[in-house]
Amino acid sequence: MNKGKFALLFTFAACFAVIVFFWLLAVPPENFTADRIVMVLLISPIFAILLAFNLSRFLKQHGYSLRQVHVALEQNIADFIYEFQRLVFIHLMPIAFLGALIFYYGEFTPAIAEFLSLFALIFALSPLLFLGISFFVAMLQVYERVRKKSLLRANFFNFWIWIHLFVILLIIISKVLVQPSELPFQKAYFKALNDGVFNLLIIATMNAIFGVTGRMVAREKFPILLHLSIPLVNSFVAVKILMA
């Protein structure tokens, strides 16, 4: 298999990993019936193929290739191994010890239990998530050069981001000021939005700990990261409502 085909295959695997990961977060375990599992397995490759094709086409339009992305990916994998070891011994060990103490002394509240269970879920699925995140981080390193050639498009993306943030802010304010029972048509969306944003914040925090996206934020690449996260929030909310 030549390098071009391998890069395309790896891109598909990365896209598939991200989509399946968000499906796992979006759908409650009790809703994972056999027919829905089959539906996820059938739908996810279709989205992964479309996403991989669009990414490949986008890079080719600007004179780049997937192979350049995978060169950057090799360095990210080396960084991940180092950051993962540091994460386990510096961050996870104290958290596990603190959790054991809280549990032993009987102060294991539902909120703490939910947080630790979500933390454990993210950590257990982190290899799957890392496969996708590493690819997108490498692509962003290439995209940083692409963005300089398309300032008009970048400005449009920033405007689009602020519009979405304004809409989300209005939704949050309206939820605080108006009880959901008074707006029954928005109850499902409110719940899905809260769950989706909360889980995405946990994912962002975990990746900042890993040091993968953390370094990118430090290099002022936050707008494009935000641009990628907003479509994920929207799709996440849609899946939550669909599978509720």
From Swiss-Prot:
<feature type="transmembrane region" description="Helical">
    <location>
        <begin position="5"/>
        <end position="27"/>
    </location>
</feature>
<feature type="transmembrane region" description="Helical">
    <location>
        <begin position="37"/>
        <end position="59"/>
    </location>
</feature>
<dbReference type="GO" id="GO:0005886">
    <property type="term" value="C:plasma membrane"/>
</dbReference>
<feature type="transmembrane region" description="Helical">
    <location>
        <begin position="196"/>
        <end position="218"/>
    </location>
</feature>
<keyword id="KW-1003">Cell membrane</keyword>
<protein>
    <recommendedName>
        <fullName>Uncharacterized protein AF_2132</fullName>
    </recommendedName>
</protein>
<keyword id="KW-0472">Membrane</keyword>
<keyword id="KW-1133">Transmembrane helix</keyword>
<keyword id="KW-0812">Transmembrane</keyword>
<feature type="transmembrane region" description="Helical">
    <location>
        <begin position="87"/>
        <end position="106"/>
    </location>
</feature>
<feature type="transmembrane region" description="Helical">
    <location>
        <begin position="116"/>
        <end position="138"/>
    </location>
</feature>
<feature type="transmembrane region" description="Helical">
    <location>
        <begin position="159"/>
        <end position="181"/>
    </location>
</feature>
